């Protein structure tokens, strides 16, 4: 049974600001093999969710350079996983963070922005780490930055992925036993 727990936005932002200008040794650096931006965005979302989906090909996980899901490092695959694109949702069981497309005004700290170039390719993932009035501030790797104004980037379009929550799996039998014994409701997130 899947239940939804809140996304910890403040943790995603704290992680982004701590690691944007250096590489966390727990993760490979993809800067020389296509870019590190979505790897970094995934790390930030992981900091706010602490759940991975280990489904081969259609999940969202990182174990090592050689053992990771395409959605961990690929801009389009990340989008497909987070927005539960039909090709992903039907194959990965739904565990993990999930997002919806929102306007720039509705985007919040800890959300992810993806940029499209003039030729139509989505090429960059950034994490929203601040707002100054109407200005969105982002942190990212591959051109490492902290709190850079989004308006200073040159891009044709942007999409804003609002992380709605995190789906986790709860064992139905365990749920029943806890409820029967009068314990805490296991379908409710424990903070």
Residue ranges and their predicted role:
Residues 1-76:
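N-terminal capping segments
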Residues 54-57, 125, 150:
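Short, solvent-exposed loop/turn and secondary-structure capping segments
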Residues 62-138:
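...with weaker cross-activation on analogous glycine-rich loops/strands in unrelated enzymes
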Residues 137-142, 150-191:
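Low-complexity, Gly/Ser/Thr/Pro-rich intrinsically disordered linker/tail segments
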């Amino acid at each position: 049974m899947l239940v939804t727990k809140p996304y910890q936005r403040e943790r995603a932002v704290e992680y982004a600001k701590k690691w944007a200008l250096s590489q966390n040794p727990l993760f490979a650096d993809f800067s020389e093999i296509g870019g590190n931006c979505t790897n970094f965005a995934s790390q930030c979302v992981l900091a706010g969710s602490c759940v991975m989906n280990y489904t081969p090909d259609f999940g969202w996980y990182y174990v090592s350079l050689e053992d990771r899901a395409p959605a961990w490092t690929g801009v389009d695959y990340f989008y497909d996983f987070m927005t539960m694109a039909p090709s992903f949702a039907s194959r990965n069981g739904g565990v993990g963070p999930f997002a919806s497309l929102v306007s720039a005004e509705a985007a919040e700290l800890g959300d992810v922005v993806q940029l499209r170039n003039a030729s139509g390719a989505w090429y960059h993932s950034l994490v929203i780490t601040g707002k100054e009035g109407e200005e969105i501030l982002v942190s990212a790797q591959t051109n490492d930055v902290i709190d850079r104004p989004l308006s200073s980037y040159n891009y044709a379009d942007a999409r804003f992925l609002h992380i709605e929550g995190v789906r986790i799996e709860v064992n139905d039998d365990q749920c029943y036993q806890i409820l029967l014994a009068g314990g805490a409701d296991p379908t409710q997130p424990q903070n």
